């Protein structure tokens, strides 16, 4: 029953933001409360770009779940959201663009039913 649009931010891809917001909704956590501190996200971004040579610093869904798991060890609010992962099973998600294989696979592993528009996020010939 929820319709929400998500766009990429400087820290997260749109799929990652949608995933965190779905967990917040399930856990009844106020939208203004961050589940993952930028102090956790930013070093991961630096690792992705500087050490691993990625061009996109934004966290994919699998990376944001790892960051959430780390946050959950010290933050009770993050822990509560993390415990909601099982509740995502059989939920439906729709993207207005074709997701990366990483994000699509993460939703599949979480048993989220995903549909996508027939449009790529970028104009690159290959889409990972």
PLM regions: where:
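C-terminal binding/interaction regions
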Residues: 31-128
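A short, polar/charged loop-to-alpha-helix boundary motif
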Residues: 10-27
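Short, small-residue-biased leader/transition segments that mark boundaries at the very start
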Residues: 2-5
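Active-site proximal loops enriched in glycine and acidic residues that flank catalytic Cys/His/Asp
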Residues: 7-8, 97
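Generic alpha-helical structural element
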Residues: 8-11, 74
């Amino acid at each position: 029953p929820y319709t929400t649009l998500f766009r990429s931010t400087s820290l997260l891809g749109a799929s990652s933001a949608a995933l965190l917001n779905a967990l917040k909704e399930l856990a009844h956590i106020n939208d203004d409360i961050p589940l993952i501190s930028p102090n956790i996200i930013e070093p991961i971004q630096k690792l992705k770009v500087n050490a691993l040579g990625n061009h996109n610093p934004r966290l994919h869904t699998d990376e944001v779940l790892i960051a959430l798991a780390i946050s959950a060890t010290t933050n009770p609010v993050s822990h509560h959201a993390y415990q909601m992962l099982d509740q995502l099973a059989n939920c439906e998600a729709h993207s207005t663009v074709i997701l990366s294989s990483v994000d699509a696979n993460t939703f599949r592993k979480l048993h989220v039913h995903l549909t996508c528009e027939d449009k790529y996020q970028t104009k690159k010939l290959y889409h990972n």
